[in-house]
Regions:
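Soluble catalytic domains of enzymes that build or remodel membrane lipids, polysaccharides, and related
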Residues: 1-221
Length: 221
């Protein structure tokens, strides 16, 4: 939400998301550009998000520019559960997966806890499928070393314009948009569902709401 992405836009994103009927909804940060008193009406429709296994989020760098702690409390009241260096287990039919999340790297500049992957994975079980929410894609290699199966990230806006993505790539270890393999880890970098106030243009790099389907390993009898 921002002056360019008002309540009506958020409402449309929420409606489109609900149409997908996903088991879980996750948001990988940079949800707002503005202070709570100015933007609350815009983000209020996020409270309509529903999913069988919950709605989860992590902070992006932009949340810290406008008071991340207050924003996190506001989002929590709307039903978004923030995984700030924490995890959550989803169990079904005798199996489970572990959803972990880390804070953004800029947090320490604001006197708050920076990303702590070890803490986020602390309650995961050996051999358990782990999905990591990390706003920035650049540390996918570290996540792979720690046994994460899937990392979901954003931050890059997909490069915003075809060609510009080549300039964005070096600062993000080459991860800009779409699906990548980093060792045994699958990394998906979303273009984001909106635009950035600082450069409100897209050309060849569309915004997106991504539906990801997970498949279990075949059972060998």
């Amino acid at each position: 939400a921002s002056r360019l992405l008002p309540r009506s836009w958020i409402q449309d994103v929420v409606a489109r998301t609900l149409e997908l009927d996903a088991d879980m909804v996750v948001v990988t940060g940079d949800i707002i550009d503005g202070w709570p008193d100015a933007r609350f009406s815009d983000i209020e429709p996020l409270g309509q998000l529903r999913a069988r296994d919950g709605v989860f989020a992590v902070t992006g760098n932009h949340e810290y520019y406008f008071g991340a702690e207050n924003w996190s409390k506001t989002f929590e009241k709307l039903g978004l559960h923030f995984l700030n260096n924490a995890g959550y287990r989803v169990s079904r039919d005798g199996d489970s997966l572990y959803l972990a999340g880390v804070t953004d790297a800029v947090a320490s500049s604001y006197g708050l806890s920076g990303p702590d992957l070890a803490q986020a994975l602390k309650s995961s079980r050996p051999g358990e499928t782990v999905i990591l929410l990390d706003h920035r894609p650049e540390n996918a290699g570290l996540a792979a070393e720690r046994g994460v199966s899937l990392q979901l990230s954003g931050h890059t806006h997909g490069g915003m314009i075809s060609g510009l993505d080549k300039l964005v790539a070096p600062a993000n270890k080459g991860f800009v948009s779409g699906l990548y393999a980093e060792g045994s880890l699958a990394l998906y970098v979303s273009n984001g569902s909106g635009i950035w106030n600082g450069f409100p243009f897209r050309l060849g790099k569309s915004s997106e709401i991504t539906l990801i389907t997970l498949h279990g390993k075949p059972v060998i009898l």
